Amino acid sequence: MKTFTATPETVTRDWFVVDADGKTLGRIATEIALRLRGKHKPEYTPHVDTGDYIIVINAEKVTVTGNKAQGKTYYSHSGFPGGIKQISFEKLQAHKPEMIIEKAVKGMLPKGPLGRAMFRKLKVYAGAEHNHAAQQPQVLDI
């Protein structure tokens, strides 16, 4: 019997919706990253994108433990001298709450073209509404 190896043509992808209301950032991000990679499936193959599509709603209501709301800092750099910018978790949650979950999940995915393809299957929304009803997503309880 031959070892099964998934190919891009044989992969079946499902759509799941995750409610981030009151959930801890790291715990929800690890489960999302695992499902984007496809490691929960028996046909997982490391060099093939076997993961599912994940829709995250209520990103503005995600929580962090301890005093990380004030102490956690996100950095970005323009590439020019003196071009570093920083923003706290609280301010980022007020302005762009989707970015918090996106950055947490992106850091848990592989680096390179395959990781970027996996990341494209993540859809994050600040509120409770999303525009993927046509895909009939299943509710995923994390």
Swiss-Prot record:
Gene Ontology CC terms, in alphabetical order: cytosolic large ribosomal subunit; ribosome
Subunit structure: Part of the 50S ribosomal subunit.
Chain segments annotated as transmembrane: none
Name of encoding gene: rplM
GO BP annotation list: negative regulation of translation; translation
Protein family membership: Belongs to the universal ribosomal protein uL13 family.
UniProt-recorded name of the protein: Large ribosomal subunit protein uL13
Functional note: This protein is one of the early assembly proteins of the 50S ribosomal subunit, although it is not seen to bind rRNA by itself. It is important during the early stages of 50S assembly.
Disulfide pattern: none
GO molecular function: mRNA binding; structural constituent of ribosome
